Every structure is written in structure tokens, then in C-alpha cells.
């Protein structure tokens, strides 16, 4: 399966049991900031935004004082999993980022999708990629 297939079929799909509810945007991005695949709605990000995200995975708490920025949007960093998952909130939506061996899996959501549903979709694919050595 192509990387775009993972984004289209495993991230931008209907949430299990909630037909028509899906993430707003999603992407798989290499640790170096290169986009492997993304939805048409994924924001154009700046290199320094990706650097900040990678720094937070290596130094958990790095983004907490300033917030997580992606495509010029600021998210308040909320409880994640140090070195593995970063979660952010903005209004009725938010973001989940799962780190794998070689990539970052991004999911962005708005209501009616819940934070837990976004976490489930993003982390399930991230865990699968980790199992595959990616």
C-alpha cells in the first residue's frame, strides 16, 4: 500500500461506528519534515514548527509553555505520552501526533469527532507502523 493509501484508508476514513465522522486532516511526515503523504486539507507547515514537534518528542514538555504550532495554528498541549504521542487542543478541535521509528502520524479533528476518537485512529496506525519497523 502506498503512503497515500494509509492516509486515505486508515486516517481519513469514517470513525468506527460513526458513519460520516472523520478527521479534518491527516498526514504522515518523516522525522526530517518531508511529507510522505497527506490529505488535501492538511495545513502547509513551516520547518521550525516541525523542528519544535520533534524537539518535544526528544525533550517532553518543550512545547508546553509556547503551545504546538502547525500551519500557523496554535494548539494548547495537553496530556500525551512522553516521547511517543503529543496531543493538542484548540477550541472544539485538536490534534494528535504519534511518533514511529521513522515518521510522525498526524490527525487533526473538529467536532463531532472527539479527542478519544482521533487518538484511536492516529495511534492505531502509528502502532501498526511501529510493528512493521517503520
Curated annotation (Swiss-Prot):
Annotated keywords: Actin-binding, Allergen, Cytoplasm, Cytoskeleton, Disulfide bond, Phosphoprotein
Q: What happens to this protein after translation, modification-wise?
A: Phosphorylated by MAP kinases.
Q: Residue positions of the PTM Phosphothreonine?
A: 114
Q: Where is this motif: Involved in PIP2 interaction?
A: 84-100
For this UniProt entry, the molecular function terms from Gene Ontology, in alphabetical order, are:
actin monomer binding
Where this protein primarily resides, as one coarse class? cytoplasm
Q: Does the keyword Ligase apply?
A: no
Cystine connections:
13-118
Does this entry carry the keyword Disulfide bond? yes
Q: Which GO terms describe its cellular component?
A: cell cortex; cytoskeleton
Q: Which InterPro entries match?
A: PFN, PFN_euk, PFN_sf, Profilin_CS
Q: Where in the cell is it found?
A: Cytoplasm, Cytoskeleton
Name the family.
Belongs to the profilin family.
Task performed by this protein:
Binds to actin and affects the structure of the cytoskeleton. At high concentrations, profilin prevents the polymerization of actin, whereas it enhances it at low concentrations.
General remark: The variability of the residues taking part of IgE-binding epitopes might be responsible of the difference in cross-reactivity among olive pollen cultivars, and between distantly related pollen species, leading to a variable range of allergy reactions among atopic patients.
PANTHER family xref list: PROFILIN, PROFILIN-5
**Subunit composition and interactions:** Occurs in many kinds of cells as a complex with monomeric actin in a 1:1 ratio.
Could you tell me what this protein is called?
Answer: Profilin-3
Organism of derivation: Olea europaea (Common olive)
